[in-house]
């Protein structure tokens, strides 16, 4: 099964968020926007990415594909995400 590691960049301050998805990055970005403004999950309200999206406006955020790869376990997917976070931070 394929997955994508992606980054979301705040174009006002160049801060980034790195994530993983099995969906398209466009669908995942729409999900992030939905959670930032309409989440039913209380923890989403305190997520730094979502706070920034609400304060800065979604027009200041862009999503970019970093890597598409085949994975077999959730551990492999998480490991790849951690590698990209370390590489970019």
Task: Kindly label every feature range from the protein language model.
Residues 1-89:
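Structure-specific nucleic-acid interaction/processing domains
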